[in-house]
């Protein structure tokens, strides 16, 4: 899966699950997460936790 496709899946998952897309929260290291092999779901949860916890 390309990074662009991964980000689109992450954004859709975040919007459906949390009611916020990735552009609605502070910048996070999405590219690093992708390069490290995280799924878009794992990355979404980590980004949300980073923003709110």
From Swiss-Prot:
Pfam families given for it?
A: DUF5419
Taxonomic superkingdom: Viruses
Designated name of the protein:
Gene 87 protein
Q: What is the species of this protein?
A: Mycobacterium phage L5 (Mycobacteriophage L5)
For this protein's source organism, the top of the classification is: Viruses, Duplodnaviria, Heunggongvirae, Uroviricota, Caudoviricetes
């Amino acid at each position: 899966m390309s990074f662009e496709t991964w980000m689109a899946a992450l954004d859709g998952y975040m919007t459906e699950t949390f009611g916020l897309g990735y552009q609605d929260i502070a910048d996070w290291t999405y590219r690093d997460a992708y390069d490290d092999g995280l799924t878009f779901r794992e990355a979404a949860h980590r980004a949300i936790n980073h923003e709110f916890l």
